[in-house]
Structures are given as C-alpha cells and as structure tokens.
Amino acid sequence: MASKTEVATERDIALNWDVFVTAGIPTVTSDLAPGTKQMMWSPISSTLIFGKRDAVLVDTFITVEQADILADWVAASGKNLTTIYVTHGHGDHFFGIAALLDRFPNARAVAMPDVVKLMRQQASPDVLASFWKPLFPDQIPDRLMIAEELKRNVIDLEGHDLVVVEVGHTDTDYTTCLHVPSVGLVVAGDAAYNDVHLYLAESNAKTRGEWIAALDKIESLNPRAVIAGHKRPGNDDSPKIIEETRQYIRDFDRVAGTTTTARGLYDKMLELYPDRVNPGGALWLSARAVKP
C-alpha cells in the first residue's frame, strides 16, 4: 500500500521573530537634567518577523551608523525582506528606512495614512533643523524616505496575517501596533515601554488617559509577547510591561497634578522609578514639557 506524503504549506509553518535593540546614544544639548553632564537617547528596538523564507521588519533607527548596523543584522538572518512597517511617526523609528531599502531594494516601507502625515512633518526641514539635527549633528541620514500608505490594515507574511491595530495617542498621535495572532505577538511601538522612562512630552491629562486606553486595547488582544519600541537591552518581552507602562502613566499624571516645577516632577518620578533607563533623557524632556 502506497504511503501518503503530506506537503506542508507556507501557512502551516509558524512564524518567528527576533529583536535588535540599539544602545542609547549621546545627544548634543545644553538642557540637561539635574546632576547630569550628558543627555542620552533611549535604546530603540527593531523587530524582524519571519517565516521560512520572507521577513517583515518593524521600525528602524535614527542615525546612519545605526541604520547600517541594522541592515547588517537583517542581512545576517538570511531572510528575504519584503516589508518595513513603521508603527508611528517619530523620526527615531523611521529615519533609517533609506539605508534599509538600499540594501533590500525589493522591499517596501509602509505605514498607516495618519502615520505617514506625521512622518512627513518629522522629516520636514523645519523639524530637522530645530530638533533632530542639533541633537545628532552630522548623524542624521541625508536622504530620508517616507513610507507608502497602507490601503488596508493587514500585511501578509507567508499566508499569516500581521494585523495593524490603531491605538491613537500614546507617546505621540496616531500610533499603531502590529499584532500577529498566529503566534500571540504584539510589536507595540511606543505604546508600551520596557523598563525605560516614558516619553510624555507630548501629553496632557486627556491624552495620558488616551494612552491608558490604548494599553487596555493591546491587553485585550491577550498577547503572549509584547515588544516595546524602547526597552532595556536584554530584557524579555513579557506582557507584564503593559501594566507597568499603565502604572507609570498613572503615577506621572498624579505627580504632575501635585508638583509645580519641572524639577519637582522629575525628582518625584525619579524617587518612584530610580532604576528605569534614561531618566536624564525621556523623563527630563517630559517634565520640562509638562511643567515649562
């Protein structure tokens, strides 16, 4: 009797992922947190989701050097990069697109329409000249590329759906995460932070509430792994960071209501969170913005 051989389809092959976290890098600024001599930019993560052959990269980095290192990392995976997905419009998550597409010319960069609008704003001459280039002199790529607009909220990867979930205001407007239901993964962008001080400089009491609602929405997906856009290198990607991020926002909102100065807000949050990464960057910028 002849044996029956079953051939696995691409859809039968589970997806996997890997995360690259770039170390924090120094900035150039005179607006320093108390007791510090240098403001650092927080570590940033980029996630490669892959199947048997193809891969999707979620978010890139800021500087030329970071982009080249990220491209080398993707190339070392041996996967065919088809797509770069951008979770939100902050420059530190998309300035490296051009370098990646130079290395992987058959790939395309995509984002939701509202994210594309913010990307254009971040890459405008005014914002580059007033914010990014002074912080990172001679380090920002000369050529910045804007993602194409996604026409639907699903990216196909070897028969698996990568689902865009729009979560509204988190550390900026119109943010998204990427949900991979087949493996219980959420790539959260900056909607969740992993043991790094949150960037709340664009927040007020109303939008801090919106960020908490965004975290509730992510939690409702019941993920088994949540990758933060800014995470302590070496940390795992436990879903517990959803509640940790939510509690940090609650604490910041409460302390913002009981302090009158940036220094007071900064000091009190540092008492509550003495060990989180980069208080002199993200926390100080947040305190200065909320208590000008």
Positions of PLM-derived features:
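Active-site neighborhood of phospho(di)ester-bond hydrolases with catalytic His/Asp-centered motifs
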Residues: 58-60, 82-90, 110-113, 186-189, ...
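Active-site metal-binding motif and surrounding structural segment of the metallo-beta-lactamase
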Residues: 65-111
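Divalent metal-coordination and catalytic microenvironments
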Residues: 49, 59, 74, 88, ...
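Metallo-beta-lactamase
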Residues: 3-7, 116-243, 251, ...
